[in-house]
Amino acid sequence: MNIAVSKPPLTIRLCGPRGFCAGVDRAIQIVVLALKAYGAPVYVRHEIVHNRYVVEGLEAKGAIFVEELHEIPAEHREQPVVFSAHGVPKSVPEDAQARNLFYLDATCPLVSKVHKQAMRHQRLGRHVVLIGHAGHPEVIGTMGQLPEGTVSLVETVEDAGVYEPVDRENLGFVTQTTLSVDDTAGVIARLQERFPAIQAPAADSICYATTNRQDAVKQAAPGCDLFIVVGAPNSSNSKRLVEVALRAGAKHSVLVQRASEIDWNEIGDIRTVGLSAGASAPEVIVDEIIEAFKARFDTTLDLAVTVEETEHFLVNRELRSIELTTDDMAFVNGNASNALPPKATAGI
């Protein structure tokens, strides 16, 4: 006689918005469209977005990822190269032109806006203070828009407290788009306290998607025994969501790339789990994690939606006449199962 074993109850607070933002969607679409328009291989400088599963899915379609342009073989110089969503220094397109490469720029339009804000400060004679994380590709790209010596990087409130500019009266700040909203507010407040004349950008540099995802996590996290963020360890916005969840009241918060990374032995007695995804994480991985919990718990989904996102960014003019198939669109939107490579080759 078979006796059914009841599963313990669990509520999953599913955040919305989560996952792909308009800039990520556009960048992935550019690579897919380039492959359809020009054929394989299409080269991509740096990971198009910080998610290995997106990268491996594009590699399966014929994309080749490189870190520098000199890695592109001479026999493939006529194939396009795509610049990642994070943006690049001015020296990169200059290098591409010198090498007679055809390039497509997939820089997020909101990152490009920060570039313009920084250049405007510099044109007006202000030394630019960039609030961001050293070594992040977006920060490297933004600093690379300006002449050497005209921009300084500040990461923390402590940095802002010891920063000493040459001219305290002619400063302007911009920020990396994927920072913690609350942390950045503290850094800005310290800079404004020390340098009352410092000029803000005309519009907030932190992007709408970063803000929206953090707001949803703040709403869902209080009282959660565990909060899971789907994202890559090199994804700035995903790591910030982990921090936001802890500050908002989650007892524990982790960053995972696949359900296979969840340590079920360490979870213990839980009743409420929060779940979100960084802006470069496909929705199909969120679904995978929900199914993993359903296999072990009697789950109830509780949606924590703060706003509906409707933003959409156009792809490059050269690609607008190319049509995507239904399968292409599923991949671009993060909903295709072929966005996920086999778990054994996930590189975790």
UniProtKB/Swiss-Prot annotation:
Cofactor: [4Fe-4S] cluster
Record-level GO BP terms: dimethylallyl diphosphate biosynthetic process; isopentenyl diphosphate biosynthetic process, methylerythritol 4-phosphate pathway; terpenoid biosynthetic process
CDD domains in alphabetical order: lytB_ispH (cd13944)
Residues annotated as binding [4Fe-4S] cluster: C21, C108, C207
Binding site for isopentenyl diphosphate: H50, H86, H136, S235, S236, N237, S280
Role played: Catalyzes the conversion of 1-hydroxy-2-methyl-2-(E)-butenyl 4-diphosphate (HMBPP) into a mixture of isopentenyl diphosphate (IPP) and dimethylallyl diphosphate (DMAPP). Acts in the terminal step of the DOXP/MEP pathway for isoprenoid precursor biosynthesis.
Database matches in PANTHER family: 4-HYDROXY-3-METHYLBUT-2-ENYL DIPHOSPHATE REDUCTASE (PTHR30426:SF0)
Name assigned to this protein: 4-hydroxy-3-methylbut-2-enyl diphosphate reductase
Originating organism: Agrobacterium fabrum (strain C58 / ATCC 33970)
